Amino acid sequence: MPKGKKAKGKKVAPAPAVVKKQEAKKVVNPLFEKRPKNFGIGQDIQPKRDLTRFVKWPRYIRLQRQRAILYKRLKVPPAINQFTQALDRQTATQLLKLAHKYRPETKQEKKQRLLARAEKKAAGKGDVPTKRPPVLRAGVNTVTTLVENKKAQLVVIAHDVDPIELVVFLPALCRKMGVPYCIIKGKARLGRLVHRKTCTTVAFTQVNSEDKGALAKLVEAIRTNYNDRYDEIRRHWGGNVLGPKSVARIAKLEKAKAKELATKLG
């Protein structure tokens, strides 16, 4: 190898130059002027925003919202808090399906029945008194009497009764008398069963022989969820949940305290 000559290694091929795409220049029409909006005070008309928070709602909406927030903020005693533990959807659907079979008759149905009976009597076929069919019994006073006499097989209470004092004693009474009870969502759902707008509570007294198995299954599930868990339920207080502002304020104070402590310890 001759002196002064360096050994030549293999040359790496240079990276291919990235071919830049030539962007076509946007042709700006000079007739279209830019007029940016200024949303400062007293300037342009403001854009459409969601102003739900600032709407003056009707009184009944305000009250129900305030009630919901109070139930979260204040400490709710167990007797009232138990009404938040409603029956699960699947069991509730089965229960309502069964209850639908035992709806009481409407005014029109009663009128037609009595009319048919009167026509029979007028035709001289004799008036045979019919046996009363098993139906749901509704209303606080009726259900309370049935529970006290141990005639109710199952009691269904609405979770949103207002005022709650109307039914607050019922779970304790049912447990004392050994009657299975459950809390279901919606007084309107119970109301539909008995042809009213709303209903506080309904009770099963008797069912037909073909539905006894279905009722027994429901009673077993309900007893496990409510009657047997009564001691546990009456220990649970509700509410006492702070709002986002209070949580943020407390967090800020805690942060400041921690910072101060850190500087002291150095």
UniProtKB/Swiss-Prot annotation:
The modification N6-acetyllysine is found at residues 34, 97, 217. Keywords: Acetylation, Chromosomal rearrangement, Cytoplasm, Isopeptide bond, Ribonucleoprotein, Ribosomal protein, Ubl conjugation. GO terms for biological process: cytoplasmic translation; maturation of LSU-rRNA; translation. Gene3D superfamilies: 3.30.1330.30. Its main location: cytoplasm. It comes from the Eukaryota. There is a cross-link at residues 11, 20-21, 48, 97, 125, 245 (Glycyl lysine isopeptide (Lys-Gly) (interchain with G-Cter in SUMO2)). GO terms for cellular component: cytoplasm; cytosol; cytosolic large ribosomal subunit; cytosolic ribosome; focal adhesion; membrane; nucleolus; nucleus. GO terms for molecular function: cadherin binding; RNA binding; structural constituent of ribosome. InterPro entries: eL8/uL1-like, Ribosomal_eL30-like_sf, Ribosomal_eL8-like_CS, Ribosomal_eL8/eL30/eS12/Gad45, Ribosomal_eL8/Nhp2, Ribosomal_eL8_euk. It is found in: Cytoplasm. PROSITE patterns: RIBOSOMAL_L7AE. Component of the large ribosomal subunit. The ribosome is a large ribonucleoprotein complex responsible for the synthesis of proteins in the cell. It is linked to Chromosomal recombination involving RPL7A activates the receptor kinase domain of the TRK oncogene. Belongs to the eukaryotic ribosomal protein eL8 family. Component of the large ribosomal subunit. Interacts with CRY1. Interacts with DICER1, AGO2, TARBP2, MOV10 and EIF6; they form a large RNA-induced silencing complex (RISC). This is Large ribosomal subunit protein eL8.
